Amino acid sequence: MTRVDVDAVFKALADPTRRRLLDSLRANSGQTLGELCRNLDMTRQAVSQHLGRLGDANLVATIRRGREKLHYLNPVPIHEIYERWIAKYQRRHLVALHALKRKVEGGRRGKA
């Protein structure tokens, strides 16, 4: 994933409406624009613009079925971000937090 791709994903995820769209697609992938509008109580134009940003970030894929355009969540960019920025640091931080928790809780027991 290039820096431009990563920046596009983070910019897309920064907007709460786009995160709600992704949540809606995660719960029920393959929705039409109309279905997404009903779930979010937004105009078609607003939802369409947000879907465009999500598509630019490769977070949403579309497939035409007849006259309908179905929108699907593409979790790959989010997984790549997880692998790059979260997974490799996760274990070390969890071990440190667990040690801190034991130390703090041990200190509380001694003072009680």
Spans of model-derived segments:
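Alpha-helical residues within the helix-turn-helix
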Residues: 38, 49, 55-56
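Amphipathic alpha-helical dimerization/coiled-coil segments
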Residues: 1-5, 26-27, 79-112
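Beta-hairpin "wing" of winged helix-turn-helix
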Residues: 55-66, 72
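Conserved H-loop
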Residues: 46
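N-terminal helix-turn-helix DNA-binding core of bacterial DNA-binding proteins
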Residues: 4-43, 68-80, 84
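A cross-family signal for key residues in well-ordered alpha-helices
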Residues: 11, 23, 55, 61, ...
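Short amphipathic alpha-helical/adjacent loop interface patches that line ligand
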Residues: 40, 51, 75, 90, ...
